[in-house]
């Protein structure tokens, strides 16, 4: 057993030291994936069935006519956030060219020459721009995931332009501007859905910080043996996800894995762990995952995570007092966001919820 663990660490280290990620393996024309990427046999099905989108489909909410249909839209958000934890939004106000340009920028960076990308490769999370493969490469007990990523905190203190690669610099600033606007609206609508004043969640700094996490999922020669992203829930208040048309995102709903089918121009919204906690389970943060890419072209996704600040601080959060009563007492102890975030990343994406540690 000790030898196997040592071998796994050595192989992960050797993979990491190439600084070229999963894209480097594809460029080397491999036909079999390295064993560090292999899931335990049978774990992909996890004894939980897949269901087609004809059986289940996550809610789609149209923001067109929001000024005249606000109450109706708030009701739909309340239902989606409490029963699904996810919904897709269309006519959200972010121009299609902005969505396309950020996807193109992510692709351009990940398809740069290796010597260019290597200059940004780091495992130091304090850097303004962090490029690597699997943030939890050394901490997760699960297999290595079939994807490469880069991350950058865009608010409250935006990076200097020269901190970002030329390939995606302009697109990241423009996209982030639109994400902050949409995030502002979503937190207003969620506050109203909870029966609170519209600025309640914003006043708690729930959207003060914005982290862009941009994934590149190369085609996989053995997609049934590995996974793109392990099942997990998000350590944020709210996440806005832009996915391309390849698909592969699934959420866990009523003991089944349900496909989140791509809709051109739509954005996927999901509730994070922090929002579930402060609402005392009135909204839910659900597990989701990404299957390994079966397509002939790479899958691109851009996740915008909203939290309190650029770096998690020791702000303490607990369930909102207005949402508690004698019949609905607090279900969670207060959390220190910095402590929570450090524990979440130390645990890695291992398929277990970290929020459960804070249940009373």
Swiss-Prot record:
Coiled coil: none
A biological process from GO: biosynthetic process
Annotated binding of Fe cation, by residue: 232, 234, 288
InterPro entries named among the record's database cross-references: DIOX_N, IPNS-like_FE2OG_OXY, IPNS-like_sf, Oxoglu/Fe-dep_dioxygenase_dom
Disulfide bonds: none
Residues noted as binding 2-oxoglutarate in the record, renumbered to the chain: 299
Annotated GO MF terms: dioxygenase activity; metal ion binding
Record bears the keyword Oxidoreductase: yes
Pfam families: 2OG-FeII_Oxy (PF03171), DIOX_N (PF14226)
Entry GO terms, CC: extracellular region
Enzyme Commission code: 1.14.-.-
Keywords for this protein: Iron, Metal-binding, Oxidoreductase
Cofactor binding notes: Binds 1 Fe(2+) ion per subunit.
Tissue localization of expression: Constitutively expressed in leaves and blades.
Cofactor entry: Fe(2+)
Residue ranges of domain Fe2OG dioxygenase in the record: 208-309
Family from the record: Belongs to the iron/ascorbate-dependent oxidoreductase family.
Protein name: 1-aminocyclopropane-1-carboxylate oxidase homolog 6
Source organism of this protein record: Arabidopsis thaliana
